Curated annotation (Swiss-Prot):
Belongs to the HesB/IscA family. GO terms for biological process: iron-sulfur cluster assembly. It comes from Bradyrhizobium diazoefficiens (strain JCM 10833 / BCRC 13528 / IAM 13628 / NBRC 14792 / USDA 110). One of its GO terms (molecular function) is 2 iron, 2 sulfur cluster binding. NCBIfam families: iron-sulfur cluster assembly accessory protein. Gene3D superfamilies: HesB-like domain. GO terms for cellular component: cytoplasm; cytosol. It holds the Pfam family Fe-S_biosyn. This is Uncharacterized protein blr1755.
Length: 106
């Protein structure tokens, strides 16, 4: 389904531990928008919704809704530290096109 690199898991666990809200895991989803039709969204979530798939990545729970599941199948999420720009990257084998920003696909 979805894979997270060690770097991504560590960055997310760090964000969750410094968050003031209760966190049951990470929600990963897509929504219409961006340059190429879809954009990625991630956020801390309290708990999974009834139709979510729950994936365990090294102790981190990842929640994926049924609408996003097919589009995200096989995606690897990484966290890259770079002097100019640090952040999450998505390597999605289902994307026919990708925006240069890396946050949108079609």
């Amino acid at each position: 389904m979805i894979n997270l690199t060690d770097s991504a898991v560590n960055a997310i666990k760090s964000a969750i531990s410094s968050s003031e809200r209760r966190a049951g895991g990470l929600r990963v989803m897509i929504e219409a928008g961006g340059c190429n039709g879809f954009k990625y969204k991630m956020g801390i979530a309290d708990e999974p919704k009834p139709d979510d798939t729950v994936i365990d990545c090294d102790g981190l729970k990842v929640f994926v809704d049924s609408k996003s599941r097919e589009h995200l199948a096989g995606t690897t999420i990484d966290f890259v530290l770079a002097p100019e720009s640090s952040g999450f990257t998505f390597h999605n084998p289902n994307a026919a096109t990708n925006c240069s920003c890396g946050k949108s696909f079609g």
